[in-house]
Amino acid sequence: MCVRRVDILSRFDIALSLLQSLTHSHTVLRHLCFLPTIIYKHLCEFTISFSSPVISTGQHIDVGDEDYHDGDDDVDYTDDVDDVDDPHGSPSQLLQGGYQRNQHYGGGNYQSGYYRPNKQHGNGYGGQYPKKYGSGYKH
């Protein structure tokens, strides 16, 4: 082990003396003291430039069953209640349709955040108002 260490030191000395004889200047030798620091700095910059930071783009990633509806998932929202004869339906059927729809959102009528009536039920007011006075949500 000692022989190897001496061998490395002697090679360093040879390189140093060769460099000194080539330049005839002590300026290069002074800058050689900072060489390890400069190499380390460049290695750190190289590593940082090739790492991939995680940047949030704010885009929606579809993960399947969601607790909210943002238009990106592929659940069919029109076929939840098929047994309604009247296009508006009775209040209980409207609630049932809302409950079945909101099962996509994780539970009961109001647990999911908002109630969106089934399209085949009109605007959700049982025909009392014209469709344009519905919930304000474009169905």
From Swiss-Prot:
Q: Which domain of life is it from?
A: Eukaryota
Stretches with biased composition (Polar residues): 90-103
Cite the record's Acidic residues compositional bias ranges.
64-85
**Listed InterPro entries:** Miracidia_Ag_8I
Region described as Disordered = 61-139
Instruction: Give the family this protein belongs to, as stated in its UniProt record.
Output: Belongs to the immunogenic miracidial antigen family.
Name of protein: Immunogenic miracidial antigen 8I
